């Protein structure tokens, strides 16, 4: 007589549908807090529906997607999962605001080998907080449990955001001209870029991430969530014709600022107009990193750069400070000769 074969289930293969359902129940309250009036229906459908907000004459949708890179590795190693969701939202919505777009809705993709409901709930709670800060609705997502694809407690995630801007109000850098002034908005730390180098510095310096650093642990300082600039900038746009914005992410100053400048213009940055936050000095010293490489990899304390007309500089600075931003005069736009570098940093870092 042949042996009876074992009856297999999806759970036997490593996929726990019940855990996925438990996660959905845990995050319903998070999703509800982010709801906008344009959102139609609730979570759980095959697709999410959202109307264009009233008041737009020629609405243009702006979409973006991003992740948080190897900052996740550090978060996983330190078992701190409640802030990387904020990072995920920030990386997307800060890219949208650069073009003048108001973020409307956000979706996330979360993938892991074995779903830990508590960890995933912490991550999604952070995503919800980021959406609240930016006024963006969390309308859906995908949780993928994929045994054999990720080791242990590892996970990865990606975010997808859509915003809207009036066609005549799109900010694309075409108005930038010599004489325009640069404004810096302070970052909260490394944000979500350069973490492969950060982790290398931690390795070669044998640094203790639990050691005190400026009143926090070193690990907490490095994992400080990316600052979200959406609401203050949307308010500024109502009063000032901002000519360009640059989100200082991977590639630092050298690569991000030229993305929003016409070929005939260059940004002259006053390198002594601000003090690098201590974490960047620590990274440079412990990694023996050149100043050029620092500006190429990290934001060095500047999370966003604005280009405004010269006669709007003081008004812009005053408004941004009133709105809670640490803002300062960073430099100016000058004419660039053919083939000339489009970013010049004058004066050393403090």
From Swiss-Prot:
ATP-binding is among the record's keywords: yes
Pfam families: AIRS (PF00586), AIRS_C (PF02769)
Keywords: ATP-binding, Cytoplasm, Ligase, Nucleotide-binding, Purine biosynthesis
Compartment(s): Cytoplasm
Classification via SUPFAM superfamilies: PurM C-terminal domain-like (SSF56042), PurM N-terminal domain-like (SSF55326)
NCBIfam families: purM
The family this protein is said to belong to: Belongs to the AIR synthase family.
Name of the protein this chain belongs to: Phosphoribosylformylglycinamidine cyclo-ligase
Organism, as annotated: Pseudoalteromonas translucida (strain TAC 125)
